[in-house]
Design a protein with these regions (language model features):
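Active-site-proximal beta-strand/loop segments in catalytic clefts of secreted hydrolases
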Residues: 191-192, 222-225, 249-252, 283-286, ...
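A short helix->loop->beta-strand "cap" motif at the edges of active sites that frequently abuts
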Residues: 275-280
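Serine-esterase "nucleophile elbow" of acetyl-processing enzymes
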Residues: 144-146, 152-228, 232-242
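Structural motif
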Residues: 153-155, 247-249, 281
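Oxyanion-hole/transition-state-stabilizing segment in secreted/luminal serine hydrolases
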Residues: 211, 228-266, 270-274, 285-290
């Protein structure tokens, strides 16, 4: 008897309905609101005169490099907070394009995720998952258990441009400002693709977002994939921002150790001149050092900047050895490609870097009182 061949189903949603992504809202009482307007509060983003989501003024980004000019529109670190008594929250986003990766989930690069905020504690509610065939935007829905006034936070995509974002609520629902942060002066992060969030599975799994949720602190993510090279223009902009703590995660994108040496100490000196009282945390590359002399040289350069600061009387600096972050018993599981963290890697980074951020935040808060 001839063997019967069975068709292989390539759509997993037809096998497991729990993996289905809804592409239509099917709501007849939804009202959409533009998050660029009150009472929504945006964090980690710069709108400017053109009213476009970005992370810094275009004039600054354009003066740095073509990479920074392009990645400036990636909304890494962007958040919107609001409160409502609607029993569902929908989103409708408009995207000019969709960035695809072979080693980063689309939920991280292009998705949004929702948190409930209560008394400084953020509780994960849902990820708004982009459909697999998304090209220019999508809609998604999160249903809530009841109608009561609550504060929410939505995290923006890490590696995509967002032209418009609308929040959908049940018609007649109340809407107001969301809860503010305990530490409302933002922690400032500068660095590479890792700093930008590659390759987290959802936006809030970047290490900065994990720290922000843990410590109830605002933050600005100025990570630029392949484009963090310590240029004077970006250094001047970093120094112009009023930050609570500056996490200098600059190492990887310097084309070589010589470039890093020529730019790392000047970055510190320029920043410290404008911000004498802002704590600085230096982080060396997190890649596991395995017979790589260049990475060893880079670590020493970052450490030398830290030692220079200490030797010149600066007690508002600390150094984190990136090799130690991804070393140890579970060092093999922290990345997707020996460089970019997976969620376990970002959690590990948040644990180590977050401890230093917390120490520095408490020091500055004590000093301000």
């Amino acid at each position: 008897m001839a063997e019967t061949k069975k068709k292989i189903e390539d759509d997993i949603a037809k096998i497991d309905k729990n993996l289905e992504v809804k592409t239509t809202l099917e709501l007849d009482d939804v009202v959409f609101y533009d998050v660029k307007k009150a009472p929504f509060d945006l964090y980690g983003l710069y709108l400017g005169e053109l009213d476009v989501f970005k992370r810094m003024p275009e004039s600054v980004a354009n003066s740095v490099s073509t990479g920074v000019a392009s990645l400036n529109f990636n909304t890494a670190g962007g958040r919107v907070r609001f409160s409502t008594d609607s029993d569902y929250i929908a989103i409708k986003c408009v995207l000019p394009m969709v960035r695809n990766f072979s080693h980063m989930p689309r939920t991280g690069s292009t998705g949004f995720d929702l948190y409930e905020v209560e008394d400084g504690t953020c509780t994960y509610v849902k990820t708004f998952v982009p459909p697999k065939d998304v090209t220019d935007g999508y809609e998604s829905l999160a249903r809530l258990p009841d109608k009561r006034m609550r504060s929410f936070e939505i995290n923006f995509p890490l590696y995509n441009r967002v032209d418009e974002l609308y929040i959908g609520l049940r018609e007649g629902s109340r809407i107001d400002h969301g809860d503010r942060y305990k530490y409302d002066k933002p922690v400032l992060y500068y660095g590479s693709s890792i700093t930008q969030g590659g390759c987290a599975s959802k936006p809030s799994n970047s290490y900065q977002s994990i720290i922000s949720h843990d410590l109830d602190c605002d933050h600005i993510n100025l990570g630029f994939s392949g484009s963090a090279k310590g240029e004077k223009e970006i250094v001047d902009y970093l120094a112009s921002l009023d930050a609570s703590v500056f996490v200098c995660d600059y190492d990887y994108n310097a084309p070589n150790a010589e470039h890093l040496k020529a730019t790392h100490l000047p970055l510190y000196l320029a920043y410290r001149e404008k911000n004498p009282d802002t704590p600085i945390i230096f982080v060396s590359g997190v890649k596991v050092i395995y017979r790589n002399e260049d990475l060893i040289k880079r670590r020493k350069i970052v450490f030398d900047t830290y030692m220079y600061a200490k030797e010149h009387g600066d007690d508002l600096v600390s150094f984190i050895d990136g090799h130690a972050i991804f070393g140890g018993r579970y060092g093999n599981v922290y990345t997707v490609d020996d460089a970019h963290p997976n969620d376990a890697g970002f959690l590990r980074m948040a644990d180590v870097i977050g401890r230093e951020v917390e120490i520095m935040l408490k020091r500055t808060a004590k000093k301000d009182t």
